[in-house]
Amino acid sequence: MSQRKYFGTDGVRGEVGGPVINAAFALRLGYAAGRVLVRRNASRQGGRPQVLIGKDTRISGYMLESALEAGLSAAGIDVVLAGPIPTPGVAYLTRALRLVAGIVISASHNPYQDNGIKFFSAEGTKLPDEVEAEIEAALEQELGCVKSEDLGRARRMSDSQGRYIEFCKSTVPHSLDLHGMKLVVDAANGAAYHIAPHVFRELGAEVYAIGVSPDGFNINKGVGALHPESLAEEVKARGAHYGIALDGDADRLQMVDASGRIYNGDELLYAIVRDRMRQGKVEGVVGTLMTNYGFELAMGRLGVAFERANVGDRYVLEQLLARGWQFGGESSGHLLCLDCHTTGDGTIAALQVLAALHANKASLSDWIADLRLYPQVMINVPLQPGQDWKTHAGLAAARAGVEAELAGRGRVLIRASGTEPKLRLMVEAEDFALAQASAQKLADSLG
């Protein structure tokens, strides 16, 4: 794939008012994407192509939505405005309404000062690389406008949230009845603020909701999946059975039990996979380079194949599709259940966990008791300009020694930071002291 100027691994993202997240660029991006989609759907019957736009609750969403809408209309695309809705909700509605593409305006777990724009295909999956490349090329052309009779229209979709709520509920058996269960749901003042509490209430749970008062500036601020400690306190204070924390665009999940214990993505994925094993539905699972070694060992004990992808749910999805598997995720809480949805979905993942516990009459701590996560130690070492750590003899020797010592009892991961001149040295081992000593050996070898 050729070098991209604008698109990263998760669409276009940056600080509002910066080079790419501004009204002028969004207008151009809407027009460029619109021209590509019109050309690719020239033989489509039934009028102009339609594109869905959804967003989270950032103040900049209004500006970017209007600019994208104008650009798409100028290219001859009809626009459906879904309003605030989770990223996976855009994927679902794009597919359900047979639209040619979906657009999400969100920077996920980032603060309100950032925003992003990413695309879904008509199938509710990430836009193919070749289509992104065509949009990049179209961005280099002048902004134009189709003839007046070919301009696109825009309409607001009044029932987008209700449709998505029903879809979420449809992913669990009708026998799942949450009456008698008390939940705290934290929507991070983000896209799921109206949706997530309703999903669990309509299945019978008593729900106390936090992070459901967005003001355009408080998305992810001290709440949500990046701050599960506040949820843990709420769960204990209210005597709830579980807490559910989503991030700003609701594609990430963390959970808390009645004792205040926080469960990360590895633990929640294990809960889902173990239940699907009971149903005979698991061929393999994809994690990432950061997935805990204890999870890998647990998959081995279950007899489930396990593979690691690069960090990022996009890469997990690519491996799942390539292998024909259905389950994968990241420690951060991006969980994919492709038997339910085409993309990662925090609300649906939480439902799968609760359905597993309900079906097996188990608590979350008991259900994942066989999963033992290994202590992890990370040391960041500054890299000197021009220093090639891959050919550093001292580091290579230290790594060989550490890996020999840890054989079957841990692992080593060494990778350069993608944002700063640092080398990240990560060690997981049976006990913290061993992990810490091993990581320090690696760091000292670079001294």
Curated annotation (Swiss-Prot):
Q: EC top class, in one word?
A: isomerase
Q: Which cofactor does it need?
A: Mg(2+)
Q: Which UniProt keywords apply?
A: Isomerase, Magnesium, Metal-binding, Phosphoprotein
Q: Which GO terms describe its biological process?
A: carbohydrate metabolic process; peptidoglycan biosynthetic process; UDP-N-acetylglucosamine biosynthetic process
Which positions in this protein are listed as binding Mg(2+)? S108, D247, D249, D251
Which residues are responsible for catalysis?
A: S108
EC number in record: 5.4.2.10
InterPro entries tied to this protein: A-D-PHexomutase_a/b/a-I, A-D-PHexomutase_a/b/a-I/II/III, A-D-PHexomutase_a/b/a-II, A-D-PHexomutase_a/b/a-III, A-D-PHexomutase_C, A-D-PHexomutase_C_sf, A-D-PHexomutase_CS, Alpha-D-phosphohexomutase_SF
The GO terms describing molecular function are: magnesium ion binding; phosphoglucosamine mutase activity; phosphomannomutase activity
Q: How is the cofactor bound?
A: Binds 1 Mg(2+) ion per subunit.
- List-wise, which residues carry Phosphoserine? S108
Catalyzes what? alpha-D-glucosamine 1-phosphate = D-glucosamine 6-phosphate
Q: Which domain of life is it from?
A: Bacteria
Any one GO CC term of the record: cytosol
Q: How is it modified after translation?
A: Activated by phosphorylation.
Reported function:
Catalyzes the conversion of glucosamine-6-phosphate to glucosamine-1-phosphate.
Which family does the record assign? Belongs to the phosphohexose mutase family.
The record, for NCBIfam families, names: glmM, PRK10887.1
Entry-linked PANTHER family: PHOSPHOGLUCOMUTASE (ALPHA-D-GLUCOSE-1,6-BISPHOSPHATE-DEPENDENT), PHOSPHOHEXOSE MUTASE
What protein am I looking at?
A: Phosphoglucosamine mutase
Q: Which organism is it from?
A: Bordetella avium (strain 197N)
Q: Which gene encodes it?
A: glmM
